Every structure is written in C-alpha cells, then in structure tokens.
Amino acid sequence: MVNEKRMRETFEELVRIYAPSKGEREVCDLLKKKLKALGASEIIEDNNGSVEGGDSGNLIAVFPANAEGLPSVALTAHMDCVECCRGIDPVLEGSVYRSRGETILGSDDK
C-alpha cells in the first residue's frame, strides 16, 4: 500500500533540491538515506561521477525478496534536472502538482 503522505513529502523534498547535471550529490545522499530507511540490504554508488566529471555516481539499491517465486523488479531513474531547476516551489492543486509559474516543476524522475 502506498503511503501517500510520505510520497508527497518525499516528492516535495526532491523537487526543491537544485540538482543540475553533474551536480546531483545532495539528491544522491538523500536517496541513499531514504533507501536505507526503506530496507535496502545493499546500496552501491558507482564511480560514474568521477568518470563523467560529476559529483555523484549512479545508485544501485538491493531489496530482499518478500515472497518466493516472484520475478525480480528493476526501477531506473535519473537524479538531475534541467539547469533552470533552482528555486522550485511545488504547489499541490487537488491531486496535481504544478510550479508557481516562475520555474519549471523539475519533477521528471523525482
């Protein structure tokens, strides 16, 4: 079951972080903390940041199986946002998030 309150709080926290390409360290650190709290048995950060000139690598999180015989699932996403992602203040209108109009929402994978 989805914890809607936690989902909204996490979304709002993530979109407020300034994270242009090659500057995703703050998002990376936050995701590591949240993945650990969700029960990841292993969290790996690769060296892609140093190879590509960024300040963080790709994250790989492993969660233990919770049922026998079910297939594995992989989720992928990126942590950066287009350059105009500074000063984002998301607004919830009904069930839809929007920007206030001065910025993008910057939520494509967040």
Locate predicted features.
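Short amphipathic alpha-helical segments, especially helix-boundary/capping motifs
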Residues: 4-9, 35, 90-96
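N-terminal capping segment at the start of a domain
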Residues: 1-25
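Intrinsically disordered, low-complexity segments enriched in polar/charged residues with Gly/Pro
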Residues: 1, 47-48, 75-77
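Active-site metal-coordination/substrate-binding segment of hydrolases
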Residues: 55, 69-110
